[in-house]
Amino acid sequence: MLEIAIIVAAIAIGSGIALVSGGLVGIGEGYVAGKAVEAMARQPEMEGSIRTTMILGQAVSESGAIYSLAVVLLLIFTVALPLVDRLLELL
């Protein structure tokens, strides 16, 4: 019974860490967008190239956040919930 509780706690901690990483990706994307706007203000003739590079970089970094969200959902719904049900049966 204690083992199940420890596993569920570890899943909760891991899910929290993964969600924090997704939030940090959002902060990074905002920083990149701000710097891209600054670059476009300095060099308006390069606007198309800067925007394309910014969007490509944000798409690549967003994929990490999407994968972390997928891992969190898998951990919670395929591992943690059945273990919680089992733990409640034992009580």
Where are these regions (language model features)?
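Hydrophobic, small-residue-rich transmembrane alpha-helices and their short perimembrane loops
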Residues: 1-91
